[in-house]
Amino acid sequence: MLLKAAPAFALLNTQGENLSPLFSSSKSFSPKNGNRFVVSASKATNHKPLTGVVFEPFEELKKELMLVPAVPDTSLCRQKYSDDCEAAINEQINVEYNNSYVYHAMFAYFDRDNVALKGLAKFFKESSLEEREHAEKLMEFQNKRGGRVKLLSICAPPTEFDHCEKGDALYAMELALCLEKLTNQRLLNLHAVASRSNDVHLADFLESEFLVEQVDAIKKISEYVAQLRRVGQGHGVWQFDQMLLNEGAAA
């Protein structure tokens, strides 16, 4: 109804009487139109803060200054970064380096003169470099959050990838698919650690930099496995290898 005006206004009747004052006003206006109500603005101002709490930065900084470490070997930037997240990041760094080592062994195998599948060699070499970049990206994040990078042992990968039934190309690509799925599961486990620790920075980092890319890699290698199963051994493998050599990209 018209009687319920905004809080910054007061209502006057036709005789100039204030019917429902909401704030004090130094000026009033006389009505000119019959029995209709006239709305008049109020000049009063509410000086109370909206939240009732005044931000005093130097008072709050006193508490934070007590938390700044003075020991030289202690991180200064670390904040809300749990030991579980730090350890899980180091484990994932090891996973990425192991992946890079396996892919590098595959590159060396397919680059042999008696194998000579240059497209597969190129694909696995690029995949090895990409896994190494993933490890370095995790190391940079570890340092950014104030953690300490601890490199773990890397297992020696196999050097032979020939398979009497499947052939070397299909066998190696199936190994790559299993490796990418295993890596995806480890990333999901790392994301679960971040969620349990309420570490939104780590969770966002994994979602934006790793998880989407990992699903894309699994999809692409799955298609490669399906294509190699379809062409069988022989000339079809050479055609597939030429496709990777001219158009392929790393997982």
Swiss-Prot record:
| Catalyses which reaction(s) | 4 Fe(2+) + O2 + 4 H(+) = 4 Fe(3+) + 2 H2O
Q: Which domain of life is it from?
A: Eukaryota
Q: Which GO terms describe its biological process?
A: intracellular iron ion homeostasis; iron ion transport
- Which GO CC terms are listed, alphabetically? chloroplast; cytoplasm
Q: Which residues bind Fe cation 1?
A: 96, 131, 134
Q: Where is this gene product found?
A: Plastid, Chloroplast
Q: Name one GO molecular function term.
A: ferroxidase activity
Which PROSITE patterns does the protein's record reference?
FERRITIN_1, FERRITIN_2, FERRITIN_LIKE
Keywords for this entry?
Answer: Chloroplast, Iron, Iron storage, Metal-binding, Oxidoreductase, Plastid, Transit peptide
Domain Ferritin-like diiron span(s) in chain numbering: 79-232
Region of interest: Extension peptide (EP): 46-78
Q: Which residues form a coiled coil?
A: none
Quaternary structure note: Oligomer of 24 subunits. There are two types of subunits: L (light) chain and H (heavy) chain. The major chain can be light or heavy, depending on the species and tissue type. The functional molecule forms a roughly spherical shell with a diameter of 12 nm and contains a central cavity into which the insoluble mineral iron core is deposited.
General function of this protein? Stores iron in a soluble, non-toxic, readily available form. Important for iron homeostasis. Has ferroxidase activity. Iron is taken up in the ferrous form and deposited as ferric hydroxides after oxidation.
Under which name does UniProt file this protein?
Answer: Ferritin-1, chloroplastic
**Native organism:** Nicotiana tabacum
Gene that encodes the chain: FER1
